[in-house]
């Protein structure tokens, strides 16, 4: 609000004034009698006082009536203002030239005492000819055509400057107006707040209806209490928290869409009244309680008084929103950590595969030089696995060491799915899982884990997660059909998903049929998302049925019994006993039972030996061979020595016998001496 001392004259005195406006045009410097005088009499309406409020689209002006002479001189392009002595006495400190169709500011002589000057509703394009009015306190140029702020450098006492509804594009030339109290620049074309930081006494700033897109550069306005920024294009606000006295801030009808763009308002301790209506943010459901929660000092929001109930509700909703944000932030962090961990596991997996590929290439070169026969273990022919005996490439080793500082595996439970990334995740199966969580898991996914490592934990998987029905394998190095044999030890499988990425076995045309054949006792429903039909089961049996028969027929009976589990041994013995019976004795039902048992038994002989187990077996065989060789060599050596000793004895014995007889005859030749000698020996022994 404009201070009372800056308002126009109000009251009855102004209402009763009926003055005439005298416009005198002087064409030359002729005597007074040659002047042509035009008189326009009118009743001027009163202006009791204008308020510079937050919606200051009207401007302060004074409509007092004056008897004014504007003289146009041939020596100057500006009209010269003249007032009578009576008018100067009556309105000594103010002058109103409102609605005079002025295009320039007239020359005002002899009016150095003026304090209020009104040029409202004219066509003035430039501020000039007022530098001599150094006592001027209020200057009103509302509704003109001014394009630049100028001509004010000498008005050091100016307190109120009203330049609303003009064509000003830039705030400038206010350096000397350090006493300015009210600055109205609404309805112009200003795009940036600038050059006002020195106005430390400014209390009211109106920049409504301009082209501002952001609010900043407000430092130094230590006395500012009201800031009107309505009807702009503002998207974010800064530096408002640096205004210690700001109480009223009007941001209606802008483009503010989030509280983060005006977060500095929360740090303002003096702000009590603010408006956001007409902004996108005001349409949000969280708008009111967010503003109230962050600006506890507010008394009014959007011109409505804030109640204690609204504050309480805002506090409750804000707490819920904060908890939601924290949870969302936590989930985002977990997702990012998951992404980084999976990427790291993938890098380690790629390095490992590259290392294995290099070792395999070296082994192939060695094999080409010295071919080896495939080894037989437990009657089953196994493909030879390359032994990891070669040194690790230095570059790969350094890369692995660099990655070791980050998480190298990930265990994730999402609903009913347990996802394991990296071989280290298999250790999670040793944890104490709650009964509720373990019973909830129905899908287990393996990614970036060697299948041979997975095989070793399948017994634990069966025990820890008894309800698991769906297995997924991605980047697990499934390379041959025999590996599917290992899945037979599980309790149940309804679905099986083998991702083509990192599992070359899916390139085999018949891999699905082999899975159905080998795991037929599970009665699987889907493979890679495709329903299993009865025709698929029949085709699988036709393709691979003979394989199980051949495998079982090649093994001896003791090996078959050792392969079968305890639960099947009785059935297998029954099968062996029934082989000796005549076909006529066995009824139809026993034949069906024998066929079923025979199928399960035959399939059980198709097992899979992991690379580690295979290497252990190789080491065991090598150790046995080494022991046997050493043992036989020792036996041969000992037998050879015995034989040599025996031959030597045979050669020496005749001469030894003669010498023994001779010594005995000589010893007993003197009977008395011999007896004494024997008696002496007996005495010595005692």
UniProtKB/Swiss-Prot annotation:
Subcellular location, record wording: Cytoplasm, Cytoskeleton; Cytoplasm, Cytoskeleton, Microtubule organizing center, Centrosome, Centriolar satellite
Pfam families assigned to the protein according to its UniProt record, in alphabetical order: LRR_4, LRR_9
Coiled coil: 303-341
Segments for region (Disordered): 360-388
Keywords: Coiled coil, Cytoplasm, Cytoskeleton, Leucine-rich repeat, Microtubule, Repeat
InterPro entries referenced in this protein's UniProt entry, alphabetically: Cilia_flagella_integrity, Leu-rich_rpt, Leu-rich_rpt_4, Leu-rich_rpt_typical-subtyp, LRR_dom_sf
Positions annotated as LRR repeat: 113-134, 135-156, 157-178, 179-200, 201-222, 223-244, 245-266
Every LRRCT domain range: 279-317
GO cellular component: centriolar satellite; cytoplasm; microtubule
Primary localization: cytoplasm
Repeat listed as a keyword: yes
Lineage: superkingdom: Eukaryota
Functional note: Subunit of the tubulin polyglutamylase complex (TPGC). The complex mediates cilia and flagella polyglutamylation which is essential for their biogenesis and motility.
Entries under PANTHER family matching the protein: LEUCINE-RICH REPEAT-CONTAINING PROTEIN 49, PROTEIN PHOSPHATASE 1 REGULATORY SUBUNIT SDS22-RELATED
Subunit-structure text: Part of the neuronal tubulin polyglutamylase complex which contains TPGS1, TPGS2, TTLL1, LRRC49 and NICN1. Interacts with PCM1; TTLL1, TPGS1, TPGS2 and LRRC49.
Protein name listed in UniProt: Leucine-rich repeat-containing protein 49
Gene transcribed to yield this protein: LRRC49
């Amino acid at each position: 609000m404009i201070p009372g001392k800056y308002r126009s004259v109000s009251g009855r005195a102004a209402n009763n004034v009926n003055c005439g406006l005298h416009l005198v045009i002087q064409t030359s410097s002729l005597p007074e009698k040659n002047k042509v005088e035009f008189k326009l009499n009118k009743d001027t309406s009163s202006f009791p006082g204008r308020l510079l409020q937050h919606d200051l689209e009207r401007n302060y002006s004074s409509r007092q009536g004056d008897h004014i002479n504007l003289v146009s001189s041939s020596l100057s392009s500006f009209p010269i203002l003249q007032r009578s002595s009576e008018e100067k006495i009556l309105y000594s400190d103010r002058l109103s030239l409102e609605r005079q169709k002025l295009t320039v500011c007239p020359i005002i002589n002899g009016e150095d005492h003026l304090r209020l000057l009104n040029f409202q509703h004219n066509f003035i394009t430039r501020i000039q000819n007022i530098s001599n009015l150094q006592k001027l306190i209020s200057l009103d140029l509302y509704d003109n055509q001014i394009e630049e702020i100028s001509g004010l450098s000498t008005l050091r006492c100016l307190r109120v400057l009203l330049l609303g509804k003009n064509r000003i594009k830039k705030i400038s030339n206010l350096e000397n107006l350090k006493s300015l109290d009210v600055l109205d620049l609404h309805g112009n074309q200003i795009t940036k707040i600038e050059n006002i930081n020195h106005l430390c006494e400014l209390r009211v700033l109106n920049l409504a209806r301009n082209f501002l897109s952001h609010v900043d550069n407000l430092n130094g306005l230590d006395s500012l209490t009201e800031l009107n920024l309505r009807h702009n294009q503002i998207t974010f606000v800064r530096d408002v928290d640096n205004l210690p006295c700001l109480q009223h801030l009007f941001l209606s009808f802008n483009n503010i869409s989030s509280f983060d763009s005006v977060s500095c308002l929360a740090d303002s301790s003096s702000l009590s009244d603010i408006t956001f209506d007409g902004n996108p943010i005001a349409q949000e459901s969280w708008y009111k309680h967010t503003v109230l929660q962050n600006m506890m000092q507010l008394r009014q929001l959007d011109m409505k008084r804030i109640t204690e109930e609204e504050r309480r509700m805002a506090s409750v909703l804000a707490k819920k929103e904060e908890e939601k944000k924290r949870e969302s932030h936590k989930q985002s962090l977990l997702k990012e950590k998951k992404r980084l961990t999976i990427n790291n596991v993938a890098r380690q997996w790629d390095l490992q595969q590259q290392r294995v590929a290099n070792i395999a290439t070296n082994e192939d070169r060695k094999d080409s030089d010295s071919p080896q026969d495939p080894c037989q273990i437990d009657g089953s022919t196994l493909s030879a696995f390359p032994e990891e005996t070669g040194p690790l490439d230095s570059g790969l080793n350094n890369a692995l060491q660099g990655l070791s500082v980050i998480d190298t595996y990930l265990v994730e439970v999402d609903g009913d799915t347990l996802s394991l990334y990296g071989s280290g995740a298999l250790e999670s199966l040793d944890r104490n899982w709650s009964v509720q969580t373990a019973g909830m898991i129905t899908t287990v996914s393996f990614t970036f884990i060697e299948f041979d490592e997975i095989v070793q934990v399948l017994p634990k998987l069966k025990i820890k997660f008894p309800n698991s029905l769906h297995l997924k394998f991605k980047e697990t190095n499934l390379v041959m059909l025999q590996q599917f044999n290992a899945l037979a030890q599980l309790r149940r499988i309804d679905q099986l998903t083998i991702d083509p990425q990192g599992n070359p076995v899916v390139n085999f045309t018949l891999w699905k049929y082999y899975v159905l054949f080998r795991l037929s006792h599970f009665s699987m429903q889907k493979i890679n998302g495709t329903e299993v039909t009865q025709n698929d089961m029949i085709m699988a049996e036709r393709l691979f049925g003979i394989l199980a028969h051949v495998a079982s027929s090649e093994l001896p009976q003791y090996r078959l019994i050792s392969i079968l589990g305890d639960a099947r041994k009785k059935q297998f013995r029954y099968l062996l006993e029934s082989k000796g019976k005549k076909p006529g004795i066995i009824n139809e039902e026993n034949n069906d039972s024998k066929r079923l048992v025979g199928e399960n038994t035959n399939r059980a002989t198709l097992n899979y030996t992991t690379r580690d187990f295979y290497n252990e077996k190789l080491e065991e065989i090598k150790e046995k061979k080494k022991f046997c060789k050493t043992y036989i060599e020792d036996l041969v050596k000992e037998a050879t020595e015995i034989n040599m000793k025996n031959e030597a004895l045979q050669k020496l014995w005749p001469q030894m016998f003669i010498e023994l007889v001779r010594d005995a005859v000589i010893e007993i030749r003197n009977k008395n001496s011999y007896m004494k000698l024997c008696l002496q020996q007996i005495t010595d022994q005692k």
